[in-house]
């Protein structure tokens, strides 16, 4: 009898293993956009779109050159060459409302450019130079006037003033911008990641712009450049950028932290804090999620850096406290969450804690996900704890960091999966991996990325993009990698996948809102 049970268990294990193997990602193409070598791919999440209306999706990706790739093969169709890197995700929209898509990017030469998506020729009025001598690290699109026309919002690394600018589709600078101007109330500094979110958190009928910067304050801006009022809890007449964010809300209310002795004052730095927008508790009101780099203010940043932690904020800058979930006190950091490396680029490139919101367990409430400099991917529930096997610690010898995740119900079974790429130390000869984990953080798949072409190591630092490529009914994941260009994998058994957070910053507007949450009935994404 025991032998029979053992045999049945063995068969069950084999069946489970076989099912897992059948779902292993399959490499479709690699080295997209490369020539005799591959340019370095940074944090720019690619796009999967049909640029010419022929019913077949292309891939648009950026390293230094911006490239348009055949979706089926990865062959280069168009190239806009440059020696200036692209950091923000590839933004795509019909800017001119002429039926033709535009692609909008920011570069480290201080320029932003809108291109015709099918030809990669600059649109009339572009490029613009919002931040001469500085890098465009953040770029998002938003319908600021609620009339169907998208404006382009950009953020730069300059620290003294004028960190955020807004442009019309024709490249004209919008009246009232840039901000902050010299003499404006509040505090802001440089923007060092894709740190712009756009949404109507205050129910005005028009979206607002929210931008964390290289301080412990968040800019809250109206479409005309004026600043958004903060809750009277923080004092009369204050705006968002005058209310500092701290670990303890009592310091927010008092207006400062006690930095006189080690351990007394803890607050976040938001230089790399790309925020997300969503209705976290399902009550019809939007909240903003931002993940901060918490540090001891006695020691300063980065010397006093402790860990990444999330904040949930309302439209008036107060902390989320609704539906039985009190976020006036934020989660307590878990053991082992200290930074493994920051700013030591000869060792490893930095992790970016882009915020992601998605309902992992199907209860109608959104969970909070981000990748951290502790070598883990975190997922918090609204009860301020990490469930199951979360956080997911990246396996391997030495240091490894993870890209911001994408989220989807891949197999249309009600179970949600989390997809991300990793990268190793720059001193290694490794490649990173493409990971798929389940909603409780258990690993389902791990596949090596392609060998490097032009460097000693390879990995994926940009958020994956999910979509349908020509030639298959299955969902694909496209990665922008460090040294193998754009790479595409087919995800078997996924023709009816439901995407929840399918690309960097949530969607091709790159403004912190989820692109979609619907089932593609024919598996083709149209």
For the regions a protein language model found, what residue spans apply to each?
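Bacterial N-terminal signal peptides that target proteins for export
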Residues: 1-9
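Extracytoplasmic/lumenal domain signature
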Residues: 20-518
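N-terminal signal peptide c-region/cleavage motif recognized by signal peptidases
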Residues: 13-15, 19
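Ser/Thr-rich, Pro/Gly/Ala-heavy low-complexity intrinsically disordered linkers and tails
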Residues: 521-525
